[in-house]
C-alpha cells in the first residue's frame, strides 16, 4: 500500500520548543482498504541527540509510518455493513478506528466472499471480519 503524507503539524510549548509532531497519513489498496491516520511522534521516538527541528518533513513522515503497523492490531471495529445484490450478500465494509496516545486511525475495509473461505459471506460474524481484515493488514504491513 502506498502511503501519502497529508499534513505535518508541530506542537510547540511556551518556550518555542517543538514538543511533538503529528503526521497525517492516507493510503488506499485497490478499493479494499482505505486508511487515514494522524500519528503523533514524541521525543522518545527520535534518535538520541536528535530534535524535531533537525528532521525534514520526509523524515517525520517516515517515523510516523514506522509507528503505524504497531497500532493497526489495536483497532476497534465500530460497525460493519453488508451490501446485498438480488437478496444475496456480496460484500461488506468494516469500519474501524483507534484513538490512542495522541494517534488517530480510521480504517475502512471492503471484503467479499474470497476473504472468507470456510463459510458463506452471509453467515460471517464479528470475529470473522476481524480475522479477514487482520490477514489483509499483515500482507500490507508485515509487522501488524
Give the positions of each predicted feature.
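Viral virion structural and adsorption modules
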Residues: 1-19, 28-144
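Conserved two-metal-ion catalytic palm core of "right-hand" nucleic acid polymerases
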Residues: 23
Amino acid at each position: 500500500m502506498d502511503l501519502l503524507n497529508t499534513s505535518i503539524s508541530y506542537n510547540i510549548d511556551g518556550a518555542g520548543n517543538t514538543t511533538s509532531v503529528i503526521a497525517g497519513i492516507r493510503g488506499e489498496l485497490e478499493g479494499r482498504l482505505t486508511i487515514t491516520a494522524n500519528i503523533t511522534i514524541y521525543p522518545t521516538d527520535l534518535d538520541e541527540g536528535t530534535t524535531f527541528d533537525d528532521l525534514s518533513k520526509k523524515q517525520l513522515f517516515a517515523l510516523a509510518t514506522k509507528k503505524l503497523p504497531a497500532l493497526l492490531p489495536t483497532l476497534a471495529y465500530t460497525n460493519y455493513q453488508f451490501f446485498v445484490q438480488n437478496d444475496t450478500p456480496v460484500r461488506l465494509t468494516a469500519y474501524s478506528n483507534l484513538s490512542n496516545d495522541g494517534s488517530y486511525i480510521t480504517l475502512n475495509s471492503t471484503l467479499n466472499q474470497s476473504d472468507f473461505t470456510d463459510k458463506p459471506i452471509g453467515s460471517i460474524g464479528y470475529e470473522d471480519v476481524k480475522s479477514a481484515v487482520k490477514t489483509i493488514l499483515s500482507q500490507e504491513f508485515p509487522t501488524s
